[in-house]
C-alpha cells in the first residue's frame, strides 16, 4: 500500500512511481511520490520497515526544478523542495517518465493555494473533535480571572467593530477614568491606533503590564496631552509606585531612526515619572537572516570541527538571550519593583508580543498549564494582531517576501529554554511546543491563519475551520509533562545568559537521525504519567483512610463510654 492515509477532506491530486528521494543521511531511496491537497507523501517498500516521508504542503517555502532533460548522471534531474521547518527535500525523476512536470505543477498549485485563488486546506479539513478549541479563550473570562473590571480598570467595547484599531481585539481593558472619546485621541497619536491596553495585572500589588505601539512623535517631537494623561492614569492605577517604566524593545538607534518616518519614542520630559528603557532586540529582517544562517549550519550535516564558532556566527542564541533578558526585566519590575510597565516596539505586534507573553509566563503559573498556554497564545499573539499570515506566508509562493520572519518561532524557542531551566514548572512537554510549530506552517487548522481578530471574524474561521486546540485537547496525555508540579503562585526568573542557553536540538536538528535520542522519550513520558496517576491514586486512598480513622477516633473520644487513655493512630 503506497498511498497515504487520507484525512477527512483530503484528496489525491497526483502520483509518480519510480521516484528517488535523495536522503542526505541514508542515501538514495526509490519509491512512490504522492501529492494531495494537504501533503507530500513518499513511500519506499525497499526498506524494512517501509520508509515514509510525510510533509504538509504548508511547510513548503519554494519548489525548484533541478537539471534539464539532457542532464547526465544519476539523480541529476528532479525537484528541490525548500521547507520552512529547516529541511530541504530532493527528489530525482527519470527524464523519460515525464512525471516531474506534473508533480511540479501540482506542488505549485496546492502548496501555494493563496497564490492560485484556491482555499487553504484548513477550509477543506472536516475532522470532528470532542471539544471546540475555538472556545478555549474567552476574553471576558480571562479578564475576570485577573480581577478585571475593578476600581481602576474597565472593559471597553469601543473596538467592537474594529473601528478604533483594526489590528486589536474587540474587547479592551483600559483605565477606568479615561472615557471612550479620549481613547480615540490617544489612538491618533499611537502608530496604527494601537493604544496602551492591559495585558496583565498583579493580583496583589496591582502593578500592570500594558502593551501598545510607538508614539507618533516624529522629527519635530510632537506631543499629545491625551496620551500623557493616559500613561499617568496607568501609573495612578497602581498605588504602590509613583513611577512607570516604558520598555521599548528596539535598539535606541532604531527608535531614533523611526522618528524620520513619523514614529519615535516617549521623551522623559513629556511623560512625568516615566523611565524609558531600550531592550536592544533587533528587527524582523535581522532575525530572518539569523535563521537563514542557522539553517545553513544545522542541515543537512553538522561540521563538528567548527560547530561552536559556526553557531555563534548565526547570532541566533544571542537574539534568544536578548528577548528572554527583556522579558525578565519586565517581570522583575512588576514582581519585585511593584511598578507598572508599558511595552512597545514599532508596531507592537512582533517584539512586543514576545516580551509580554514571556513575562506573563514568568509571572503567572496559569499560563504554564496546557490550557493556560493556549489562552496566552490566543490572547497575546492572535487577538492582539501578530501578523501570522505575513510572517509565515501561508499558501503564498512569494518566498522572498521581506515581511517573513521567525518571530513566533523565537518565542517558542524562549519557552523551551525556560522549560529546560524549570523542568517541573510547566504542564506541557517539548512535543507540545514542536506540535504548535509544525501546525504554525501546516495550514491544517485555522488557528494561525490571517493576521488579526478582525480578519478571522470576517473569514468565519471559527465556523469554517478546526482549531489546533481541538486536536491537542483531544489527546492531552501526549502533551503532558510527567514532572509537572502545580505551584501556581511561583514566579520564574530564568537565567538569560549565554552559558545557560543552548540550541534546541529537538527542533532544529530533529531531521538528522544521528541526533535522535537512544530511547523514545515520548513512550517514557506516557509510562511516567501512568505511574504518576497510580501513585496519586494511592496517596488519595491513604488520605481518605487517615480522614476516616481520625473521624472515628474523634467520635469515640466524644462518647461517654470512652476510656481515659485515648487510642493513638500512627500512620
From Swiss-Prot:
Top-level lineage group: Eukaryota
Subunit (UniProt): Homooligomer and heterooligomer.
Annotated function: Regulates the level of these phosphoinositides critical for various biological processes including autophagy initiation and autophagosome maturation.
Similarity annotation: Belongs to the protein-tyrosine phosphatase family. Non-receptor class myotubularin subfamily.
Residues that coordinate or bind a 1,2-diacyl-sn-glycero-3-phospho-(1D-myo-inositol-3,5-bisphosphate): 258, 283-284, 346-351, 387, 391
MF terms in GO: phosphatidylinositol-3,5-bisphosphate 3-phosphatase activity; phosphatidylinositol-3-phosphate phosphatase activity
Descriptive protein name: Phosphatidylinositol-3,5-bisphosphate 3-phosphatase MTMR2
Coiled coil: 521-553
Record keyword Coiled coil present: yes
Entry's EC annotation: 3.1.3.95
GRAM domain: residues covered: 1-67
Listed GO biological process terms: phosphatidylinositol dephosphorylation
Catalytic center residues: 345
One GO CC term on file: cytoplasm
Enzyme's top EC category: hydrolase
Amino acid at each position: 500500500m503506497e498511498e497515504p492515509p487520507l484525512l477527512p477532506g483530503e484528496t489525491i491530486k497526483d502520483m509518480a512511481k519510480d521516484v528517488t528521494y535523495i536522503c542526505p543521511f541514508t542515501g538514495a531511496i526509490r519509491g512512490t511520490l504522492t501529492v494531495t491537497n494537504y501533503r507530500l507523501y513518499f513511500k519506499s517498500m525497499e526498506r524494512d520497515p517501509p520508509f515514509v516521508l510525510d510533509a504538509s504542503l504548508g511547510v513548503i517555502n519554494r519548489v525548484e526544478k533541478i537539471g534539464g532533460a539532457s542532464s547526465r548522471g544519476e539523480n541529476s534531474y528532479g525537484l528541490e523542495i525548500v521547507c520552512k521547518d529547516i529541511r530541504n527535500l530532493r527528489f530525482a525523476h527519470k527524464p523519460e517518465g515525464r512525471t516531474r512536470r506534473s508533480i511540479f505543477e501540482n506542488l505549485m498549485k496546492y502548496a501555494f493555494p493563496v497564490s492560485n485563488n484556491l482555499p487553504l486546506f484548513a477550509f477543506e479539513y472536516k475532522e470532528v473533535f470532542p471539544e471546540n478549541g475555538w472556545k478555549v479563550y474567552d476574553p471576558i473570562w480571562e479578564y475576570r480571572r485577573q480581577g478585571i473590571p475593578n476600581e481602576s480598570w474597565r472593559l471597553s467595547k469601543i473596538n467592537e467593530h474594529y473601528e478604533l484599531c483594526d489590528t486589536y481585539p474587540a474587547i479592551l481593558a483600559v483605565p477606568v477614568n479615561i472615557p471612550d472619546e479620549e481613547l480615540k485621541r490617544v489612538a491618533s497619536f499611537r502608530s496604527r491606533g494601537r493604544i496602551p491596553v492591559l495585558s496583565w495585572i498583579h493580583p496583589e500589588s496591582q502593578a500592570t503590564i500594558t502593551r501598545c505601539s510607538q508614539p507618533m512623535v516624529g522629527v519635530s517631537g510632537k506631543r499629545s496631552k491625551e496620551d500623557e494623561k493616559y500613561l499617568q492614569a496607568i501609573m495612578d492605577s497602581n498605588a504602590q509606585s509613583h513611577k512607570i517604566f516604558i520598555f521599548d524593545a528596539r535598539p535606541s538607534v532604531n527608535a531614533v531612526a523611526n522618528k524620520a518616518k513619523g514614529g519615535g519614542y516617549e521623551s522623559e520630559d513629556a511623560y512625568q515619572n516615566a523611565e524609558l528603557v531600550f531592550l536592544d532586540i533587533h528587527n524582523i529582517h535581522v532575525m530572518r537572516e539569523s535563521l537563514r544562517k542557522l539553517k545553513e549550519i544545522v542541515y543537512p550535516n553538522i561540521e563538528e570541527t567548527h560547530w561552536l564558532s559556526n553557531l555563534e556566527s548565526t547570532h541566533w542564541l544571542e537574539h534568544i538571550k536578548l528577548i528572554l533578558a527583556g522579558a525578565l526585566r519586565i517581570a522583575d519590575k512588576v514582581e519585585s519593583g511593584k511598578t507598572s510597565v508599558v511595552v512597545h516596539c514599532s508596531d507592537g505586534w512582533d517584539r512586543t508580543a514576545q516580551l509580554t507573553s514571556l513575562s506573563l509566563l514568568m509571572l503567572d503559573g496559569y499560563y504554564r498549564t496546557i490550557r493556560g498556554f493556549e489562552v496566552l497564545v490566543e490572547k497575546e499573539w492572535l487577538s492582539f494582531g501578530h501578523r501570522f499570515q505575513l510572517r509565515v506566508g501561508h499558501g503564498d509562493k512569494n518566498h522572498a517576501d521581506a515581511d517573513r520572519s521567525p518571530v513566533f518561532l523565537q518565542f517558542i524557542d524562549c519557552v523551551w529554554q525556560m522549560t529546560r531551566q524549570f523542568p517541573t514548572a510547566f504542564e506541557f512537554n517539548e512535543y507540545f511546543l514542536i506540535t504548535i510549530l509544525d501546525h504554525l506552517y501546516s495550514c491544517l487548522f485555522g488557528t494561525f491563519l490571517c493576521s488579526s481578530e478582525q480578519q478571522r471574524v470576517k473569514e468565519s474561521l471559527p465556523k469554517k475551520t478546526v482549531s489546533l486546540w481541538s486536536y491537542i485537547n483531544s489527546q492531552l496525555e501526549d502533551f503532558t509533562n510527567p514532572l509537572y508540579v502545580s505551584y501556581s503562585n511561583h514566579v520564574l526568573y530564568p537565567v538569560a545568559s549565554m552559558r545557560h542557553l543552548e540550541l534546541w536540538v529537538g527542533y532544529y536538528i530533529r531531521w538528522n537521525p544521528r541526533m535522535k535520542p537512544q530511547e523514545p522519550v515520548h513512550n517514557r513520558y506516557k509510562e511516567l504519567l501512568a505511574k504518576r496517576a497510580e501513585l496519586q491514586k494511592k496517596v488519595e486512598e491513604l488520605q481518605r483512610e487517615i480522614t476516616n480513622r481520625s473521624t472515628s477516633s474523634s467520635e469515640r473520644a466524644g462518647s461517654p463510654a470512652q476510656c481515659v487513655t485515648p487510642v493513638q493512630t500512627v500512620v
